[in-house]
A protein has these predicted regions:
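Conserved RNA-binding domains used in RNP assembly and mRNA/RNA metabolism
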Residues: 1-84
Length: 84
């Protein structure tokens, strides 16, 4: 059985969006742009959640994204951490 130091999660979060071109204010869409990110939560504070895509046997990690917690809409655990 392999050990997993970090759980694997799926995060649905409201991302910022940009638009271009001439438009009037009435045509602007108020719908959230929902992004989906899957990764290993390697740090969490009151304001942010850091996910890494990869970690090694010494628990060093790479390819991180820092998501503001106020933008998180749903968090699903896909695989729980396992201690060896």
């Amino acid at each position: 059985v392999k050990a997993y130091k970090f759980e694997l999660v799926e995060i649905l979060w409201a991302d910022a969006a940009t638009e271009h071109g001439w438009e009037d204010s009435e045509s602007l869409d108020d719908a959230e742009e929902i992004a989906v990110t899957v990764g290993f939560p390697v740090k969490e504070s009151n304001l942010h959640l850091w996910l890494a895509s990869t970690y090694d046997s010494s628990a060093q990690h790479n390819a991180r994204i820092k998501i503001p917690k106020g933008m998180i809409r749903k968090r699903t655990v896909l695989k729980k951490a396992k201690v060896a």
